[in-house]
Curated annotation (Swiss-Prot):
This is T-complex protein 1 subunit delta. Heterooligomeric complex of about 850 to 900 kDa that forms two stacked rings, 12 to 16 nm in diameter. Residues 1-24 are annotated as: Disordered. PANTHER family: CHAPERONIN. It comes from the Eukaryota. It is found in: Cytoplasm. Belongs to the TCP-1 chaperonin family. Pfam families: Cpn60_TCP1. GO terms for cellular component: cytoplasm.
Amino acid sequence: MVVKPAARGMKPQGQAYKDKSKPADIRQSNINAAKAVSDAIRTSLGPRGMDKMIQAANGEVTITNDGATILKQMNVIHPAAKMLVELSRAQDVEAGDGTTSVVVVAGALLKAVEKLLQMGIHPTAISDAFQKCSAKAVDILTEMSTPIELTDRESLVKSASTSLNSKVVSQHSSQLAPIAVEAVLKVTEAGHESGVDLKNVKIIRSLGGTIDDTELVDGLVFTQRSCGVNGPKRVEKAKIGLIQFCISAPKTDMDHSVIVSDYAAMDRVLKEERAYILNIVKQIKKAGCNVLLVQKSILRDAVSDLAMHFLDKIKVMVVKDIEHEDIEFVCKTLNCRPIASLDHFLPEHLVNADLVEEVSSGSSKFVKVTGIQNMGQTVSIVVRGSNKLVLEEAERSLHDALCVVRCLVKKRAQIAGGGAPEIEMAIQLAAHAQTLEGVDAYCFRAFANALEVIPSTLAENAGLNPIATVTELRNRHAQGEKNAGINVRKGAITDILAENVVQPLLVSTSSITLASETVRSILKIDDIINTMQ
C-alpha cells in the first residue's frame, strides 16, 4: 500500500481553518459605518450649520439641526452605526446638548484609529492609550473652566443663549434663554441641585403668534378649552376639583346589554340617568367647587351632555379629557391627590387658586390656572409659533437650553465655546505626547489631532478656510490665549469669552468621555455574530 504525501498547504485533520484577515475586515467595516454616520451630520454643527429635512414613511416632515433628533429618525441598519446613534442619545440624556459634537468627535477619533491600525499598533494598546487621553483631556477642560454661582443669572443666560444660537430659532435666543433659566431655577430644590428633574417643566405648544410670544406660566396650562357653551370662561377665587370618575350614566360591561321593550321603560331609564347625574352635580355644588378638571375615560363620556347642562347652570367651569400621563404633573402642581370617588368629593380635597381663565392664542384656545395656593415646584412654558414645524423645533431647542442650564446647576462651571477648548486640549495633549515613548506617544498625538475636527468643521460650516483658521487658532493658543476661538458671526478669531460664547463644562467633559468610550468599544469588536432569532 502506497501512502501519498499530503498536499502542500493542507491543514492536518481536526484543526479548524482560521481566517486571520477577518477581524481586521470586521473592524474596518465597523469604522467605515460609524464614520458614515458622523459625516452625515457634520454639516449641521455650529451656529452656521445647515438644517436637515427629514421625511418619515407616512409623509410627515421634520426640519431640525439637533444631532439627537436627526440620528433618532435616521434609518440606520449597520450595528456599529447604531452605536453612534446610541452615543448621541446618551449625550442627550447626560448633558442635553452637544449631541452633534459628540458624534463628530467620535468619527474623527475613528479616522485616527484607522491610521494607527495601519501602522500595526494592536487595538488593545490603542484602546488603553485612548482611555488615558480621555482622562487627561477632562483634566485640561476642568483647568480651563470658570466657576459660576446660581445667583449669577447673567452667566446662566449666556450659556443658554450659546446653545440656542446654533438652532433654527437662533434669532429668538434673547427671548428663550431667560425663560429656560427661570424655569430650571424654579424647579430646583434647595439641597438637591444635582437631581433637577425636567419633567417638572411642562412645554405646551400653541399654534398662532410668533416665538417671541412664548411665555413662562407660574401655574398650570391645559391645551383643552373649557367645555360648557354657557358656562364661565373666567373664574376668580377658584376652588378646583380634580376627579377620576365620570359624570355620565353608568354603562354595562362589554358582555352585557340592556334591552328596552316599551316607551315606559325608556322613560324610566332616562329618569334614572337624570337622577344619577343630578346627584353627582349636587355633591359638586355642595362642596363649593367652581372649576372641575376631569380625567379622560376610554370606556364612556367623561362628562355627558346632560351633566354639562347642569354644570353650566350652577356656573362650574369644566376642563375634561385630561390625559392619564398628565395627571401626575397636575397633581404635583396643585399639590393634591385626584378624587377617584364621589364619596371623597369634599371641600378639604379642593385646591384654591386666584384665577382660572380660558385664553385665546391665534386660532387656538387654552385654559390657564394661576395663583395656586401651596403650589408644587413645577412650571409651564407656552411655546407659540406660526406653524407646526416651527413649534416642534422651538420645543426641541428650548429643551436643549433647559438641559444646558440643568448642567450648570449640577456642575457649576463653564468654559469658552467656538472650538477654543478643543484646540487647547489638542495642544496640551500633543505637548504631553512629546514626554511619552512608544505606542502611547503615537496614540496621544493621534487623539490630539482628531480633536481639531470641531474648530475645523465650525470654520468650514461658516464659509471660512478651515486649514488657515485652525493654524491661526493654534498660534494664538500657543501664545497663551486660551480663550481664543472662532467667532462665526464676525468670521474671525476673537476672545470667545468676551463675546459671551460659553457652554457648561459638563457638556464638553461628557462629550469627550462618551465619544472615547464608544470608539474603544468599536475598536475591541473583532467579529459580528448573527443569531438564529
